[in-house]
Amino acid sequence: MAPPPAKMQEIHQFLSSALTQRGPSALPYAENTKSLIRQHLLNLISSYTSLDPKTATFTHNDGRSVILLQADGTIPMPFQGVSYNIPVVIWLLESYPQYPPCVYVNPTRDMIIKRPHSNVSPSGLVSLPYLQNWIYPSSNLVDLASHLSAAFSRDPPLYSQRRPPPQPSPSIGSGYSRPLPPRQTDDAAEVYKKNAINRIVEMVHGDIVLMRSAREVETEGLLSLQSDLKRREEEINNGFKEMVIEKETLEQQLQVIAMNTDVLGSWIRENQGKAKDLLVDLDVDDSFECIDSLSKQMLECTALDLAIEDVVYSMDKSFRDGSLPFDQYLRNVRLLSREQFFHRATAEKVREIQMDAQVASIAARLHS
């Protein structure tokens, strides 16, 4: 049943006034969404007359307080053929309607939240698939209230405390207490206090979980940094050790070079005068003396072979440059090649004789 026209007029005026306020008292909703928020609340009140729009202070888990719109009242809950009313508060958060509202079951002083419950936490916070799968702009408060009623019908979230004698009446949540075993009646103020404490404990627990997650991330970052620093420390230490070893090696090599320099300098000073006397009568051919005639013949053949090789190379270059006629080039190459062959053959025979003599000498030493 729709609310009376007078009440709807009051609700229209209230929402228009609340959503058009400016300055510090303005509600924290985006300007382009205020008309949709107003329409959602009007549709909700028209479908569920037991709900009323209000403004109240909402405290976030981080301690921030902000004035928000809410729908406060009851949601019908059909259960075992009887309709009961479940008190709820639907908070329209700052991000509404892009994001879902926050719904709390708000038990009266003679009610207790069922624990455990599939959709309601001990603090009264409601969790539904419809809220988790909220889709803007198709999701709305009327459908949310319908899903709340259906979920509560499957599993009533509240039960009333028993007071002898039992009074069966369709009061809020009274029908749900019948299938439960008799239990001791708690003081209503104590129950309200317990529910408030449970809500605070849940908020603190949520803050602790967030802080713990942040600390874990920070700790992982510090451990990773510590590992990198240790690795760099090892690399620096290894590099320093290598530099020390290299320095010691260079110092040793420097000492050897200094000693060799001193020896070479002493030898030069001692033989500098002798070299001047030797240069007067020095014969290049007598600079190297062979130990025997075979070695001398080998040296001569090798020298002549290499000399002929140089001559042929020079002739080849002259022929390519055009300074040597072709017939003369062929004739000289033929003569030099024949002579070079003779010297190479002689050197090969001398090498064989030397090898035989060396083998005989080694055999004689082995038998002696």
UniProtKB/Swiss-Prot annotation:
PROSITE patterns: SB, UEV. Residues 292-360 form the SB domain. Its main location: other. Gene3D superfamilies: 6.10.140.820, Ubiquitin Conjugating Enzyme (3.10.110.10). One of its GO terms (cellular component) is ESCRT I complex. It comes from the Eukaryota. Residues 18-162 form the UEV domain. Belongs to the ubiquitin-conjugating enzyme family. UEV subfamily. This is Protein ELC-like. The lineage of its organism: Eukaryota, Viridiplantae, Streptophyta, Embryophyta, Tracheophyta.
